[in-house]
């Protein structure tokens, strides 16, 4: 008599322990439809893309036109001064236009105009979502946008500042040396230091207050305008004071005009540390705020 043994059919509900591959199998078989873990490294190419988009966006629009008009004023004033001042004194014109008008007014105003819209423009144009869904940490997105804003502001400011310097010393014996070969690089460094601090300050301010332009204008007038000119300890909390100390030490500007006594003023290294620390701290707090904040992004339907 023959005994027939039935062949067992596969269970419709397999054992989960048998269905799930072990970690070793996942590593050995990465191409068999098993999801691979995402890398936690920051993509430099993705960050560079954010920087390029920010530069392209900040390089157009009414802000750029306003910046061009504002920075044309020192050039026009320099031309008029050369025409009507008798005798013409280029050193005094440099102090009034470069260290006075540009550094005390135009640089902080230009930083405010661009940094205040650094994030808000993406919200208004409904493009912030495209940044947030990319595989980039939020803090890296903010720092990339901050870098792009600084590049745009600094490049425009440097072009007009050097143009003003050339206009002031045009036709003078020292135009090439020492003006363009010695003084101009120092002025470029001071512009970069000033804007790095101002862009970081106003970039963070745009995340902390609603009316950034109003509060930024108040800061410029009160702190960088009034407090920086008062011979009291509070002026050491301003960007303008440390920039002026560097200008007095590096450019031999007359410190008496700003009540700066080099025997009691901070050393150049101290001023550099203060300016770089301000830039770093405000950039870090801005990145932290951007990383934790929930944004109400507008949609085409208005929701």
Listing of model-derived features with the role each one plays in the protein:
Residues 51, 117-150, 299:
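Helix-loop-helix units of permease transmembrane domains in multi-pass membrane transporters
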Residues 44-48, 52-59, 140, 182, ...:
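Membrane-interacting alpha-helical segments
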């Amino acid at each position: 008599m023959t005994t027939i043994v039935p062949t067992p059919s596969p269970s419709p509900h397999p054992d989960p322990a048998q269905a799930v591959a072990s970690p070793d199998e996942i590593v050995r078989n990465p191409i068999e439809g098993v999801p691979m873990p995402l890398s936690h490294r920051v993509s430099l190419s993705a960050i560079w893309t954010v920087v390029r988009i920010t530069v392209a966006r900040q390089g157009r629009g009414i802000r750029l036109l306003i910046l061009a008009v504002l920075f044309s004023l020192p050039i026009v004033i320099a031309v008029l001064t050369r025409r009507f001042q008798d005798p013409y004194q280029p050193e005094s014109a440099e102090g009034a236009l470069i260290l006075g008008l540009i550094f005390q007014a135009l640089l902080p105003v230009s930083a405010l105009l661009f940094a205040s819209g650094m994030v808000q423009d993406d919200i208004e144009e409904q493009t912030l979502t495209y940044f947030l869904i990319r595989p980039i940490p939020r803090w890296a997105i903010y720092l990339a946008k901050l870098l792009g804003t600084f590049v745009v502001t600094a490049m425009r400011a440097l072009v007009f500042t050097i143009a003003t310097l050339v206009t002031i010393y045009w036709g003078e014996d020292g135009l090439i040396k020492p003006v363009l070969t010695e003084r101009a690089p120092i002025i470029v460094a001071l512009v970069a230091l000033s804007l790095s601090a101002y862009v970081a300050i106003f970039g963070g301010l745009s995340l902390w207050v609603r009316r950034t332009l109003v509060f930024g204008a108040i800061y410029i007038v009160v702190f960088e305008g009034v407090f920086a000119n008062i011979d009291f300890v509070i002026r050491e909390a301003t960007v303008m004071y440390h920039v002026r100390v560097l200008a007095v030490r590096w450019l031999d500007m007359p410190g008496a005009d700003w009540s700066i006594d080099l025997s009691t003023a901070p050393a150049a290294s101290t001023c550099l540390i203060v300016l770089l620390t301000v830039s770093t701290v405000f950039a870090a707090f801005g990145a932290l705020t951007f990383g934790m904040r929930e944004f109400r992004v507008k949609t085409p339907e208005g929701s």
